[in-house]
Structure formats: C-alpha cells, structure tokens
Amino acid sequence: MNSILSDMVMGEDLNASEKQRRALYKVFESGDMRFDGQVFVGVSSTGIYCRTVCRAKMPKYENCTFFRTAAEAEAAGFRPCMTCRPELAPGLSLVDARSNLARRAARMLQARCASSMSIESVAAKLGYTGRHLRRAFEAEFGVTPAQYLRTCRLLLAKSLLTDTDLPVSRVAKSSGFGSVRRFNDAFKEHYRLTPSDLRKRRGKATVQSGTITVHLSYRPPYRFSELLAFFRDRALAHVELVDDVSYTRTVRLEGHDGNVACGWVRVEDDPAGNQLVVTMSDELVPAVSEVIARVRRMFDTDSDPVVVSQALLPLEEAVRGVRIDGVRVPGCFDTFEIACRAVIGQQVSVRAANKLAGRIVERYGERIETGIEGLDRAWLRVTDVRSLACIEDAFGELGLIKTRSRAIDAMATAIDEGELDLDIGAVAEEQMEALLRIRGIGPWSANYIAMRTMSYPDAFLETDAGVAHALPELTPKERLALVEDCRPWRSYAVLALWDSLSG
C-alpha cells in the first residue's frame, strides 16, 4: 500500500496502469484516510468527484477516474461531491511534490486566492518567469496555475456557502471574484447549479452571531492535545489564549480589498470528523483564505503521518518513551512574531521568554478590539520595529539585552529590504542562510525559525536544551548521527523528543 502511495504522488498519470487503478479503487472502497487529499476520484456515471473517504454509494470500477488534485478533476469536467466535500480535504506537504516550485506556487495561490494577484506576479515572487512556472506547475499537477487558482476560489466559495450564512455578495468577494455576476456564472458553469441552489440543498447552517466557522480536515492519527500543550506553554499575553480544548488569538491581516482586517480566530478539534473547527470573527471575512492557510500551517494539517512515522522508526527504536504516530510540527500564525520570539528566547527559559515578549507587545503592540478578555494586542509589524528611534533602549528597558534587540532590528531591516523572506512560498534553505548572515542569529535560531515559520520538515536542533534532556547520554554530534536516517523529517524528530519529556 505504501508503494502505491509513492507511485500515486510521483506518477505522471494515475490511470496509466491497470494495476494502479485497481489498487486505488481498493483504497477508495476501504475509505483509507491516508490517501485523503492525495487522490480524488471522478465518477463518470454521476459527473462528480470525491475524496477517498467518501461515504456515498460506491461506484463501479469502470466508472472511476483518478486524479491527484481537485483542480485536475474539475478541469476534466467533474463537480465536487456534496457528501464528502473535497474543499475540506487536507493538502500535501512540500516534500510530497517533485517540483518544489510548483508546490510553493500552489500554496501561495491557495492562501491568496481572494486577492487580485496574477500568475505573473506569483512567478516573480518565486523568482521565475511565468512561462517556467506554468510548465513546472502543469507537469506536477496536470493543470495550469490559472485552472488551479479558479478551483481554489470555487472551493473556498463552496465552503463559505455551505458552512456560513454570509450573503452571496460577500462570499463572492471573499473568494476572489470581482463581481457577483462573474461568481454566479463561474459557479453555474463548473458546478451546474447556482450559489443559491447550493444553499437550498445544504439546509440551515449553525451560525454564531458575529462569527463564521469553517472546517479543515487532517489525516489521522493527529495529536491535537500535544499541539495545544506546546502553544499553551508559549502563549503570548494579550495575543493568545490557550485552554484544554482550544487555541484563540488576535489577528491583523490585509484583506482582499487591500484594507487591514482585525479580529480573532479560534481553533478546536473534532476528532470524530478528523477535522479542525475554525471559528473567526466576522471582521476577518475579507482575509478568510489567508486565515485558513495560516491555521493549516500552524496546526500542520497537511502532514502525512504514515510517511513521517516510517521515517522516524530509527528514533523510536533507539530512544525509549518516544512516540512517533501522529506527531505534528507546530507552525505559526504570524511569521515575524515567531522569528522575533525565537531571538528573544535564546538561552533563556520558555517562561522567561514569554514574559519578555509579553512586555514588548503590551508596550508596543497595536491594540485590537476583540471583545474577549485577555486578547487586545497584535505583535509588532516590521514597520513598527523599524520606526523605533532606538530599539536597544526601547526593548532594553523591558529587559531584552542589546544583542537580541539588534538582531530583531536586523531581521526587520532584512525583510523590509527584500533580503529575508518569511512569507508563504519562501525556500527554507535559502532563508536560513539569510538568517545566519544576521549577527546574533545562529544555527539553533535559524533552524527553529524555519521549522516554525516555513514548515521546514528537516530542521534538527542538536544543541537544544530539550533535545539534550531527551538524549542525555549523547553529544550534539551523536544526536545528529542518531537522526540522520530520519531525513527529510527531522523537525518531527525534534517534536517527538520534546513530547517524550512530558510523557
């Protein structure tokens, strides 16, 4: 089954081999969660396409065509299933793709689908020509970037129509359509029903006043409680609230209309549905695609736990008490926030770092109105840091030493001048080199920042205090040797070792 998975991800055509088609049909029959989001099934007798976990009536084998992406299925003329809802499927990690460029572009298109960006601007952001990007993208996904972007917009709209009571006009704008008429035409052309028809079919949504709720699927096993524990130990006063069942934070993002949207987002687990429940304040609707992308990154919903577990077997066999099934790497919601906090946390305890960061955000963070006690600030922007007359004095009087204040200032300058990129689509290895050129940032900080902000799967923190505590008999060089066979998933090895300390 695992070889089938590998062939499926890397193969040119899932339908070229009768053997592979039969194997994928068996996956579809079994509802194997490992393949959710990695293959979609078009059914010729109904004209719809499904996730592999769909519970609708099983179609005949001869009526099935297999696709690697929802966009590829839609380009072939299939409509999304109303039962399994392909828009909720987990995505793929960067390591899953032959073309790192194509995967980075896909992430950017999905996160920014509500904006008016062009394919040429995406290519330029990634450092390539539009022609090169289109060629790489089509070779990887079987569709053009424009087709993929259209599917992202339509599936986001379908999710908002199904899960919220937002007016159709707001759904259209929040999904990247320039007008309601254009939205209605596209929806009807591709899904053969109008947005209003979809609303009638779904019944009444459960909606809390002033909020919207969306759902994000993941592949089990998924250790949500350990992610929450990680975030709870590092919760930033005024910005984050974490309890036993949920994570809540302030949000400040640019919306599709170019205006800044401020509000809050809450994330909870629905283990029975293998999905996260994401509730956000109504003010964030203009930035909903970006909020969803950031929650996916923060909670590592695109990870494939089977592939990761196989890679970490040497660690589990060598270290008693290490659990590898379902381990996730905690990402972040605000990349600059985490980069700054990584510097603040150098050579001090987590608790001390939290207090320092809390003082900084209380003094210099922008006030955010959320209506939730304890959530009233956003972390500093790059421009906020650069506007400080003397960062050493500003942060120094709050307890941060000069070298770390200077490092934060240098990071802000590098980002502002385009020498450092922590945004979605960045190449982690290149940005780690850029980070290491900043005085005051060493290998630990560079790897930690890449792991948390860029979903870099292969960072290892051999000098980290927690890793050393989990492997007390080994030197840093021996710790590196221990996890060499875990490549390219050593970030997950770090989390497995940290988690073992609380077990």
Where are these regions (language model features)?
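HhH-family (HhH-GPD) DNA N-glycosylase catalytic core used in base-excision repair
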Residues: 2-503
